[in-house]
A protein has these predicted regions:
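Bacterial N-terminal signal peptides
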Residues: 5-14
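Bacterial signal peptide processing site
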Residues: 17-20
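Extracytoplasmic
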Residues: 32-34, 82-86, 106-108
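Post-signal-peptide N-terminal segment of Sec-exported extracytoplasmic proteins
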Residues: 35-64
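N-terminal post-signal-peptidase region of extra-cytosolic proteins
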Residues: 65-77
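Short coil-to-beta-strand transition motifs
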Residues: 75-90
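Short, conserved beta-turn/loop elements at beta-strand boundaries and strand-helix junctions
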Residues: 91-100
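C-terminal partner/receptor-binding element of secreted or periplasmic proteins
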Residues: 117-157
Length: 157
C-alpha cells in the first residue's frame, strides 16, 4: 500500500513538471524574461503601410501564408525607416486561431517589443496557416529563419 501511495504521489508531481525547453526548435521553448531582439540593418516601411513582412530572411510587402513569416509593425503609416536598434522583449506568447473553420488554422507567436530610441513600435507577430491536423505551434528556430540576418536574439540568462 505504501508503494502504491508513493507511486501515485510521484505521478502527481511529475504531472506538475513544466514542459518548458531551452531547445529553440522545440514547440515548448520559453523566451527567458529580459531577452532582446536586435535589428542589425535598416528596415524600410513603404508609403501608406504600417508594417513590413520578413520571410526566409527577406523583407517583403506581403508573404506566403503557408510559410512562417514575421510582421514588424509600427503605429503610423510610412514611409518610415526603422534604424538598427535593440528591442526589449516584454512579452512572448503562442496562439492559434481558426481562419476558415474547419479547413485552416493560424499558428503564431507574438513578441511585445519596447525600444528606448524609436516610438510607435507594435508587437511583432510571427506565424503561418495550415490544416488543423497538420499544424503546430511556431518554433523559435522558425522565427529566426524568417528574420534572417536582419534580426538576432539575445537571450537573457
Amino acid at each position: 500500500m505504501k508503494a502504491l501511495y508513493l507511486a501515485v504521489i510521484g505521478m502527481i508531481l511529475a504531472g506538475c513538471q513544466s514542459l518548458a525547453s531551452d531547445d529553440r526548435s522545440s514547440i515548448w521553448f520559453r523566451m527567458p524574461p529580459g531577452s532582446q531582439l536586435v535589428l542589425h540593418r535598416e528596415l524600410d516601411i513603404p508609403a501608406q503601410r504600417a508594417h513590413i513582412m520578413l520571410q526566409h530572411g527577406q523583407p517583403l510587402t506581403s508573404a506566403s501564408e503557408f510559410d512562417v513569416a514575421c510582421r514588424f509593425e509600427v503605429r503610423d503609416l510610412g514611409p518610415r525607416t526603422i534604424r538598427p536598434d535593440t528591442f526589449l522583449i516584454t512579452g512572448y506568447s503562442s496562439q492559434r486561431e481558426w481562419v476558415n473553420y474547419p479547413y485552416s488554422k493560424r499558428y503564431y507567436k507574438t513578441l511585445r517589443l519596447k525600444s528606448e530610441h524609436q516610438s510607435g513600435i507594435l508587437p511583432m507577430v510571427c506565424g503561418y496557416s495550415d490544416w488543423p491536423w497538420h499544424g503546430r505551434p511556431v518554433t523559435q528556430a522558425e522565427i529566426e529563419e524568417a528574420l534572417g540576418d536582419y534580426f538576432s536574439f539575445r537571450f537573457a540568462r
